Amino acid sequence: MAHKKAGGSSRNGRDSAGKRLGIKAYGGEYVIPGNIIARQRGTTWHPGLNVGMGTDHTLFAKVEGRVEFRAKANGRTFVSVLPIAAEAAE
């Protein structure tokens, strides 16, 4: 008859890899259509002008331009892409 309890394995020791969420293009940065601006879970940032939102809430640029973050009075932060003026391209 054993007089010592069998040693059990630890029930801890599991962790998931980081998901690389966050802002990928900051305010004032130049983006082209399709560039990812932010990866998020839920709507920490909301899409504004010329910004689309994917099924996983990823924000992406729809046009070429500069990224702008703007806080509204209701507490929401909107991300927009301001197109570069047509005169600057000529």
Swiss-Prot record:
Under the heading PROSITE patterns, the entry gives:
RIBOSOMAL_L27 (PS00831)
Can you list the GO cellular component terms from the UniProt entry? Answer: cytosolic large ribosomal subunit
Give UniProt keywords alphabetically.
Answer: Ribonucleoprotein, Ribosomal protein
Q: Does the keyword Ribonucleoprotein apply?
A: yes
Source species, domain of life:
Bacteria
UniProt family annotation? Belongs to the bacterial ribosomal protein bL27 family.
Q: What PANTHER family has UniProt attached to this entry? A: LARGE RIBOSOMAL SUBUNIT PROTEIN BL27M, RIBOSOMAL PROTEIN L27
Protein name, as recorded: Large ribosomal subunit protein bL27
| Organism from which the protein derives | Rhodopseudomonas palustris (strain BisB5)
Gene (UniProt): rpmA
